[in-house]
């Protein structure tokens, strides 16, 4: 018997076709699945740390003090703290027109 059926009297059907008794019926439970809304969780990114170290490599001879050293550690100029040797160091890497 469906939940929506009319209440039927237990006695013979009266001529007025009325229902004199209260009709209370409990229907089956309804099940509703409520999905949770999407949740955005932000996880912190990794922490990258480095420990840079400055290292000076050169000659321990007194002639190299105050001089600009080449990649091999040989003094380029002996002019003390001047920058006269700086141009010759970088000019060797330039492409010159022929």
Curated annotation (Swiss-Prot):
Pfam families: Keratin
GO cellular component: intermediate filament
Positions of disulphide bridges: none
Molecular-function GO terms, alphabetical: structural constituent of cytoskeleton
Record key words, sorted: Acetylation, Keratin
Cross-referenced InterPro entries: Keratin (IPR003461)
Residues with PTM N-acetylserine: 2
Assembly: The avian keratins (F-ker, S-ker, C-ker and B-ker) are a complex mixture of very similar polypeptides.
Annotated family: Belongs to the avian keratin family.
PANTHER family in the record: BETA-KERATIN-RELATED PROTEIN-RELATED
Protein name per UniProt: Feather keratin 4
Biological source species: Gallus gallus (Chicken)
